[in-house]
Amino acid sequence: MTDDPAATPRPETSVNARPAFSGQAPIKAEYLINTTPIVESASASELNNIHPDDAAEGRTDSRDSRDGRDRPDNKRRKPNKQDKKDKKGQNKGRHFPVIREASVRICRAWETTGICDRADKGDCRYAHSWEGYFEVKPNDISYRPDWSLVGEAPFVVEGERVVGGEDVVGKTLDLDTVCPVLKDLGYCPFGWRCRFLGAHVKRVAAAVDGEKEKEAGPEKRMGEWQVENWVQSEVENGWKQKETNWPEHEVLNALRRSTASFPFSEAYLKKVDPDKPFTLQNKKPTKQQPHKRKNNVLDEEEAANGPTGIPSAGDDEENAMNATENERNEEKGKVYGETEAIDVPLRPEEKRRLNWEGGRYLAPLTTVGNLPFRRLCVDYGATITVSEMALAQPLVYGAKEEWALVRRHESEKMFGVQVAGGFPNRMVPAAEVIANTIGKGGGVDFVDVNMGCPIDLVFNQGAGSALMDSPGRLGKLLVGMNRALGDIPLTVKFRTGVAHGKPNAHKLIPRFVTEWGAGALTIHGRSRQQRYSKPADWEYIKTCVTALRESVADANLPPVPIFGNGDCFSAASYYEEMDRSGVDGVMVARGALIKPWIFTEIKERREWDISAVERLEGIKKFAEFGLSHWGSDTQGVNTTRRFLCEALSFQHRYIPIGLLERLPAKLNERPPAYRGRNELETLLASPFAGDWVKISEMFLGKVDEGFSFVPKHKSNAYGGEEAQG
C-alpha cells in the first residue's frame, strides 16, 4: 500500500485517519456527509458562484465566456492571476435596487394630509387616489408570532390565510396576520401601504354616493374598509418610533447649504492650523457674490427668511466674533474666548465618566452593524453598542444617509457614534455638530474615533489606521473633538500599528489619555497590514494595558477603561483573554456576527449549544426589528430582507458545538461539508445565497420579482471581511 494519502483509502469512520487541514473545524465523523476533505474548488465562494444561483438568473446560456467554456473547441484556459483574484475578497459594486409597489406610487403629501399643492398646479407625478393601487398591491404577508417553529420542513407551522373578501381591497387582505410594527409600536405609520394590512383594518358600512372624496388620504376609508391605528408619527422630544437622533430638517438643510454655524471649530482651527482657512463648502469660497441657488433647491419662504434657528452664511463670522464671552462659554467645555486654553483637552472631571468595567461591548460593524442587529444583540445581552462608521465629511455636509447611521433605539442604554476622518478640519466640525444636534438630548453617550479601519479607501485618505502614523495631526484632531464635544466622552479604537512587526500603539497610549483626553480605549490586536489573517496578539495587548495603567497612575488621573478586541468567539475565550491581558472587557466583532447569542454566553459564563429552532427564533426577531426600523411597506420589507440575508451570510458559518470534537470553537475554522442534527440545522448551515432568501421567506413572505442578493464577501466572511478597525 502506498504512503500517498491521496491514493490510500481511508476508513470512513475514523476522523484521525483523515489528514488534518489547517483551519478546518474538527466535526464529529457521524455528521460529515463527504469523507473527502474539502479542496479549494469546493469552497463556499465556489458554491455561491454556481450559475443557477440568484446572481445568474438572467443568463440565457449557462456557460462562462470568461473561463473559455463557450469556445467552439471547449478548451478551458488555465486561470490567470486576475481570475484567482476575482474569486476572493469582496463582491464590489453590488447593487440593490429599491423595490416598491408596481406601477402606482401614492403621493406622500396627499396620503398624510389629503392635500397636495402640486396636484392643484398639475405638476405632481404621483397618484392621489387609492383606486388602482389595490389592483397591483401584493397580497398581505401571512405572519403570526405564535406560529410554531420546528426542526423539520416546513420549519414554520403556519395557519390558514383568512381572505378579507372578493372586493379589490378585501382580496389582498389576510385578516389573521399580525403587523410587527403595530405589535412593537402600538400603531403603524404605513397605513394602506402596509404589507400586513389585515392586522389593522376593519369592515365598515359601504360608502354611499357623494362620500367618495372622503375615502382619500387621512380619512382612512376605502370602500367598505377602514384602516385603524394609522398614525403619522412625528419627532417628539427627539424620539420617533422608539428611536432617537433625528436631526431637524432645518439643521440638515443648513448643513447642505453650508450656512450652519461652527463657532468653536472656526476658532480652534484658526488657532492650530492658521495656514488652512476654515470652510465648509465643497469648493473654495470666492469673494464674489454668493452663488444664487435654484428655486427647486430652496423654497421661496426659506429663501426670504432663512432656515429657522440657523444663522445665514453672512452672519457666521460676525456672530462668532461678536458674541459675548458669557454667551460663548454657555456650553460646558467650549472655550471660544480663551484662546490660550482652546488647544488643550478638557479635564477628566469635566467629562462624563465611562464605567465600563465588565461591559459587553458590540463592535461597530460596516453594513451588518445596523440598528436592528444591534437591537438583537442587546436582546441577547450586549450592554455597549456603537453605530456603524459614519464619515465626518458627509455628516458635516448634511448627508441624510450618513445621519441615518447614528440612529439609536431606546433599548441601547450605552450608545456611541463612531466617526472616521483624517483631518481636524472635518473631524472637529463633525464632533461639534454631533454635540449640538444629538448630544443635547442624550442621544449619544460617547463618540468614538475610528483609528483601525484597514481598507484602502479610508487609509489612503489619511483616516482609519493611517492616523497611527501621524501623531501630530492625530493630536490636533483629538483635542479639538474633545473640546467640541463638551462633557460627552471621546473614545478611540485603534490597531497595534500599521506595519506588521512594527507596533506603535504602546507609544501612543499614554498620550491618548494624558495629552489628548480620551475617555476610553479599545485596541485591536492586529496591525493594519495583517487585516484578519493572523491571530490577535493578546500579549501585546497586555503590554498596552500596562502602559495605560502606568501613565494614568503617573498623571494622577482617574481610571480609564481599556478594551481588547480580536478573535473572541466564546465565553471561555472572552474570560481567558481578559485574565491574560488585564483589560476591562473584550469588544466582540466577528464573533457576534456569526453567533449574536455570544453575549448570552458571556453574561451567563457558559457555552450554549443552541438549537436550530432557537437560532430561527433569533432570525425571526431580527425580521421583526427590521420591519419596525425600515418599514412594513413593500420597500421596507425588501430592505429588511436584504439585511437579513447579510446577517445570514455570516450566521451560516456557525458550527453547533454539539457537532464539534473539541471546544471551544475557533473563529477562523472552516467546516467540511456536514449535516446538522435536524433538517433546519442543515439549512441554517447552507452557504447558498438562495437558501438565505428561502429562510427570509418564512417571516417576510415570498420575494418580489426583481429581488436578488449577492453576499458582500465572496468567501462568505471567512476572514475576508472589512470592519471598522
UniProtKB/Swiss-Prot annotation:
<feature type="binding site">
    <location>
        <position position="493"/>
    </location>
    <ligand>
        <name>FMN</name>
    </ligand>
</feature>
<feature type="compositionally biased region" description="Basic and acidic residues">
    <location>
        <begin position="51"/>
        <end position="73"/>
    </location>
</feature>
<dbReference type="GO" id="GO:0034399">
    <property type="term" value="C:nuclear periphery"/>
</dbReference>
<dbReference type="GO" id="GO:0005737">
    <property type="term" value="C:cytoplasm"/>
</dbReference>
<dbReference type="InterPro" id="IPR018517">
    <property type="entry name" value="tRNA_hU_synthase_CS"/>
</dbReference>
<dbReference type="InterPro" id="IPR035587">
    <property type="entry name" value="DUS-like_FMN-bd"/>
</dbReference>
<dbReference type="GO" id="GO:0008270">
    <property type="term" value="F:zinc ion binding"/>
</dbReference>
<keyword id="KW-0520">NAD</keyword>
<keyword id="KW-0539">Nucleus</keyword>
<dbReference type="InterPro" id="IPR000571">
    <property type="entry name" value="Znf_CCCH"/>
</dbReference>
<keyword id="KW-0479">Metal-binding</keyword>
<feature type="binding site">
    <location>
        <position position="524"/>
    </location>
    <ligand>
        <name>FMN</name>
    </ligand>
</feature>
<feature type="binding site">
    <location>
        <begin position="565"/>
        <end position="567"/>
    </location>
    <ligand>
        <name>FMN</name>
    </ligand>
</feature>
<dbReference type="Pfam" id="PF01207">
    <property type="entry name" value="Dus"/>
</dbReference>
<keyword id="KW-0963">Cytoplasm</keyword>
<dbReference type="GO" id="GO:0003723">
    <property type="term" value="F:RNA binding"/>
</dbReference>
<keyword id="KW-0677">Repeat</keyword>
<dbReference type="GO" id="GO:0050660">
    <property type="term" value="F:flavin adenine dinucleotide binding"/>
</dbReference>
<feature type="compositionally biased region" description="Basic residues">
    <location>
        <begin position="284"/>
        <end position="295"/>
    </location>
</feature>
<feature type="active site" description="Proton donor">
    <location>
        <position position="453"/>
    </location>
</feature>
<dbReference type="GO" id="GO:0106414">
    <property type="term" value="F:mRNA dihydrouridine synthase activity"/>
</dbReference>
<comment type="similarity">
    <text>Belongs to the Dus family. Dus3 subfamily.</text>
</comment>
<keyword id="KW-0819">tRNA processing</keyword>
<feature type="zinc finger region" description="C3H1-type 1">
    <location>
        <begin position="101"/>
        <end position="131"/>
    </location>
</feature>
<keyword id="KW-0862">Zinc</keyword>
<keyword id="KW-0285">Flavoprotein</keyword>
<feature type="region of interest" description="Disordered">
    <location>
        <begin position="275"/>
        <end position="337"/>
    </location>
</feature>
<dbReference type="GO" id="GO:0006397">
    <property type="term" value="P:mRNA processing"/>
</dbReference>
<feature type="zinc finger region" description="C3H1-type 2">
    <location>
        <begin position="178"/>
        <end position="203"/>
    </location>
</feature>
<dbReference type="GO" id="GO:0102265">
    <property type="term" value="F:tRNA-dihydrouridine47 synthase activity"/>
</dbReference>
<comment type="function">
    <text>Catalyzes the synthesis of dihydrouridine, a modified base found in the D-loop of most tRNAs. Specifically modifies U47 in cytoplasmic tRNAs. Catalyzes the synthesis of dihydrouridine in some mRNAs, thereby affecting their translation.</text>
</comment>
<keyword id="KW-0507">mRNA processing</keyword>
<feature type="compositionally biased region" description="Basic and acidic residues">
    <location>
        <begin position="325"/>
        <end position="337"/>
    </location>
</feature>
<keyword id="KW-0288">FMN</keyword>
<feature type="region of interest" description="Disordered">
    <location>
        <begin position="43"/>
        <end position="95"/>
    </location>
</feature>
<keyword id="KW-0560">Oxidoreductase</keyword>
<feature type="compositionally biased region" description="Basic and acidic residues">
    <location>
        <begin position="80"/>
        <end position="89"/>
    </location>
</feature>
<keyword id="KW-0521">NADP</keyword>
<feature type="binding site">
    <location>
        <begin position="364"/>
        <end position="366"/>
    </location>
    <ligand>
        <name>FMN</name>
    </ligand>
</feature>
<feature type="binding site">
    <location>
        <position position="418"/>
    </location>
    <ligand>
        <name>FMN</name>
    </ligand>
</feature>
<protein>
    <recommendedName>
        <fullName>tRNA-dihydrouridine(47) synthase [NAD(P)(+)]</fullName>
        <ecNumber>1.3.1.89</ecNumber>
        <ecNumber>1.3.1.-</ecNumber>
    </recommendedName>
</protein>
<feature type="region of interest" description="Disordered">
    <location>
        <begin position="1"/>
        <end position="26"/>
    </location>
</feature>
